[in-house]
A protein has these predicted regions:
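Bacterial N-terminal signal peptides that target proteins for export
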Residues: 1-12
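Bacterial N-terminal signal peptides
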Residues: 10-20
Length: 307
């Protein structure tokens, strides 16, 4: 009888424990997705600003200026404003340097000013008309006259589960644009590299948007054409085709010229090259990270908003 009572007592206890465990499991927070970009991809890429730059706070000196004129992470620098101008101890600023006007390489439209991001600094002491700051992150060397703008914390968009690339689809019909520049002016671009696109908030683009990178079939591959003086003729080499560029090593003629076939054919699928995600946006241009590729990407390749 005692065993029966003991069993009856234990059943509710076990039920309570199981229910409690279930409640705790339901309340356990899910881990947040990891940011898709490194901090250097967020703070060191630079950007194209359509609006004129107006910062008046700048670097005017350094603790070690008698021995060097370029400053980096850990160096102490002096700013041209202080307590009287509203600068506060502990404030963090981006260090920036405008480099010049950017034009669209294909339409020649003015896109704005390219601004190089040099790093971050924190104000550690404030005087009446000057401030002392320490460079906490350096992407490039900091020099006299470099400008400052207030820091806003941003870790970049979150990653998402990989989806199949639409290798042969007709597209989504979404917003279309073009890659207009690459970081460090690379000609051939691969995954995990930074590019700049000709779409921004004006076109409804937001950080975290994914775009498919593609190229129209028939468009020349690579970034340069072969000059005419390097083109061989059949008279030089004895090949049946009138001219060749060594493309597929074909030496036999066909019944119909390739140009005629292309001219008269229906629209064929585009060549999908990869995918990119938007990291930072301005009014008419954005900074993006190429997440994956199926082939080398070039400046000038087309993009379309993915689903």
């Amino acid at each position: 009888m005692r065993h029966a009572v003991r069993s009856l007592v234990m059943v509710p206890v076990l039920a309570i424990m199981i229910c409690s465990t279930g409640v705790f499991a339901q309340r356990e927070p899910m881990p947040a997705p990891d940011p898709i970009a490194k901090l250097s991809d967020i703070y060191c890429t630079g950007y194209i600003s359509e609006l004129p730059l107006t910062p008046t706070l700048k670097v005017v000196g350094g603790e070690m200026e008698n021995t060097k004129q370029h400053f980096a992470e850990g160096d102490v620098v002096f700013l041209n404003k202080g307590r009287e101008q509203g600068v506060q101890s502990g404030s963090v600023y981006y260090i920036i340097r405008p480099l010049g006007e950017v034009k669209h390489p294909f339409t020649k439209k003015k896109l704005g000013t390219f601004v190089r991001e040099l790093g971050l600094l924190r104000v550690i002491e404030v005087q009446d008309d000057t401030s002392t700051a320490e460079i906490t992150l350096s992407c490039d060397t900091v020099e006299f006259g470099d400008l400052l703008k207030p820091y806003e914390e941003y870790l970049g968009p979150e990653s998402r589960d990989a989806r199949p690339l639409p290798r042969y689809s007709e597209g989504t019909g979404g917003t279309k644009g073009q890659i207009i520049m690459s970081r460090n002016y690379r000609e051939y671009i691969a995954a995990n590299q930074i590019v700049y696109i000709d779409l921004g908030t004006r076109q409804g683009v937001q950080p975290g948007d994914y775009f498919t990178i593609y190229r129209k079939v028939g468009k020349r591959e690579g970034v340069t054409d072969i000059p005419d003086f390097k083109v061989n003729t059949d008279r030089d080499r004895g090949y049946q085709s009138e001219r060749y560029r060594g493309g597929d090593f074909s030496i036999g003629s066909t019944n119909e010229a390739k140009s005629d076939v292309i001219k008269n054919r229906p629209t064929v699928p585009r060549k999908v090259l990869g995918e990119l995600i938007v990291l930072k946006v301005d009014k008419g241009a954005s900074v993006a990270l190429i997440t994956r590729t199926t082939a080398e990407v070039n400046v000038g390749d087309l993009i379309e908003l993915a689903n």
